[in-house]
Each structure stands twice: as C-alpha cells, then as structure tokens.
Amino acid sequence: ADKQTFGLRTDSLKKEVRQRLGIDAMLAQCVKSEAILSKTRKFDGYTVQNFALETLPGLYVCGSIYTPQSKGKHALIICPNGHFGGGRYREDQQQRMGTLARMGAICVDYDLFGWGESILQVGSAAHRSSAAHTIQAMNGLLILDYMLASRKDIDTGRIGANGGSGGGTHTVLLSVLDDRFTASAPVVSLASHFDGGCPCESGMPIQLSAGGTCNAELAATFAPLPQLIVSDGGDWTASVPTLEFPYLQRIYGFYHAKDKVTNVHLPNEKHDFGPNKRNAVYDFFADVFHLDKKKLDESKVTIEPEAAMYSFGEKGELLPEGAIRSFDKVAAYFDKKVFARLNSDTSLEKKAMDWVASLNLNDERKA
C-alpha cells in the first residue's frame, strides 16, 4: 500500500461507514433548536454549565460544558463517554474535564443513550440496542454543530475528541464521520481484533465497510492529523505496542507524519481512566492545542454531586412537555425494516452483559 491507495480506501471507508451506521437518515430528521441551559457555576479557573439539546423531535441529549475562565479563542474537545460506573458524573471524568478546561480547552461531555438523564426518556435497556450506536454518534456530531454555531470563543483549527473505553470507540468514529476534528485521543479502546463489546459501539455493521475493516484501520483514516492511543496490559489493548501502533505508524509514514501518532502504553495497568492515562491525555492536548501546562492540577477541580449536573431536575420534573418518554417513540425515526434489525434482542443483551463481566473493572459502580 501507499499514500494514494490508502487515500482511496479512506474515502471508501468514510462513505460506507456513514451508510452502514444510517447516520445521514437520522441527521436529516433532526431539529434545530436552542439548547436548554442551566445557570453557570464558577470554580477555580473554569466554569460549568449544563445543557439539554433537542436532537430528533422530542429527544434530548444532556451534558455539561466546561469552559476556561481565560479570555480569547479556545480549543474545543468533544468527550464521548464510556461505560465506567457513574457515567459522566464520576469523579475521574469531572477531574479530566475540569483540568482540561483550566488548561484552556472548552470540554463537552454528554450522557450515553439510555444512561444518565437519557433514562428518563428511553429507559436503560435502550442502551443495549443497536440504535444506541447511531444515536450516540449523532449526538456527538450535533453537539459539535451546536457549539460552533452558538459560541464565538472557539478556535476551529483546534477541535479534538477524547474518550475512554466505549468513549474511545466513539472518539474514533467521530473522527471518521466529521473532518472538522483536528486531534483525536482514544483511551483504552483501540484494537484490531475487538470492535467494542456493547451494541452502542458495534451494533451497526460498520466493520463490514469496504470489504471489512477494524477500529485500528478506522483510526488510521485520521492520518496525518495528531492522534494519541492510550493502552494498557490489562484489557484488549495489550497488543497495541506490538500490533496496532506499528500499523498506525506505517500508515502515518505514508504522509511523512509518523511523529503525529503516539502511543502511551501502561503494561501494569488495567481497564480504567486512571491518573496515568489522564496525564497522557493532558500532555497530548497541551502539546497539539498549545494549552497551559502550568494549570495542570487536578486538586483544583471541584467534584460536584451528580444532581448538580442534571438539566431536568433530580426526579426529571423539568423534562419538557413534548419530550419522548419511551424507546418505542424513537423507533418511529428509523426505517421500519432497518429498525427490526436494530431493536434490542436477547443476543445483543447477552453480548453486552458478557462483555461487562469480562472487564473485571473492580469498580463498585459497575457499568
């Protein structure tokens, strides 16, 4: 292979991934509306504001926007979430978001479909459906659209994606779907032999694109832009230093950009988003987005209670009147024949549960 050959394959992959994900049919049905915003909470060097963005009619994605208190144009990092217990509300997630914001990047995280406040609308079982794969990708793209349309303090030359585990899978997917991303950092997710154990990562047949692909090749389509792969010895990313990373270096080499892809491998660590993994992310974005590394101090981040990060109240009492309140209502937006294949079934549920059990997260808040 060479640069020209891989460039043609990249074009084919990007086109077919969109088709197999069904993303354009969903985006065509989305509404343009003002986000529901909470009051802004001020902390040491950054602020936090909750948002609820209507996507499909009556369907909302909820999250939080972490903004630096420094003036001027900022980098933007979209942060899809993984399956670690506590979701986007957990302590290490808030630490990462707040720290990157203090360093100078606007960071946005958001609930998985069927997690967090999304449960109010579709229930938790909806997450274990293939529909989650498409909707979560759609949410990431629409949040990027919203942020760029509503803010004047974003440097469009510095747009990143970063997530761990399933959030890492979606980080790669976002970079395939949208050319506006300029840096990518999937954490404890990338493997050539594993496409993500949850239907929200692998429910739609995107791995069959262009005659068959894998997440390592999808990540390679980001070349020659900066990309960090964080891996460890305790999960399916154990092979990254000997298999996936050399492959990525080869592809980046076609563009004379071998130095633009990096791997931080932690052989004695397990599947989590622990301090060493977060530090790798901070170093990467400080380098590629010129953030202020002197502001790297997680102890300055305030860990908020989960309820403070809700858009719809502690019991969902603020959910808008026209909001969808069942997973079946979401089905109306999918082609009926397609949706028959998407709906949560026992095999997908078993796959999801077996996968969670296999992780051995040793986390009191299991996925």
How would you name each of these model-derived features?
Residues 59, 84-87, 115-119, 168-171, ...:
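Flexible loop/turn segments at secondary-structure boundaries
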Residues 73-76, 103-106, 155-158, 179-183, ...:
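Loop/turn elements at helix/coil->beta-strand transitions in domains of secreted/extracellular proteins
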Residues 98, 172-173, 220:
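Alpha-helical segments flanking ligand/cofactor-binding loops in enzyme cores
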Residues 130-133, 137, 164, 171-175, ...:
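Hydrophobic alpha-helical scaffolding
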Residues 145-211:
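Primarily recognizes the serine-hydrolase "nucleophile elbow" in alpha/beta-hydrolase
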